């Protein structure tokens, strides 16, 4: 892939050269809501890492968003230049069109997934993140790989509980 060299000054004002970090993500939930998972491919220079995790009961959008969060949380140096490639219009439009910043101002009133959006904003601020949308299932090799990782993770025998989602759908219990 293309190699982009970027230069930043660190605290000691010495010149640092580092490579662009490419992140590919995908989320899946069968039944939506249902068992779900996310898949991540991270590439920087010769470095490549794949991550995936499955959950018992969640939504497609939560998995798409969680994939981006988890990937960004792996990055050690603050201020890294990152390109996130995703097929999720939900995630990309919410950030690129600035909706999520308005939701935050209004305390995420009547908005879904506030737990994940708050976690996203915390890590998003630390880096220089750009987004690129790709059409899903369109023979984009890294995106296809993420899809396979996400689906495979969602079918694992030991799945985690998506606590944030479970909390959000709990019905308030009436007084007996």
Where are these regions (language model features)?
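RNase H-like nuclease fold core
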Residues: 18-62, 66, 73-80, 148, ...
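Intrinsic low-complexity, intrinsically disordered segments enriched in polar/basic residues
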Residues: 12-17, 63, 100-103
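N-terminal amphipathic/basic-hydrophobic helices that include classical n-h-c signal peptides
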Residues: 1-19
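RNase H catalytic domain
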Residues: 25-35, 69-145, 149, 154, ...
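Short, mixed-charge aromatic SLiMs
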Residues: 92-93, 170-176
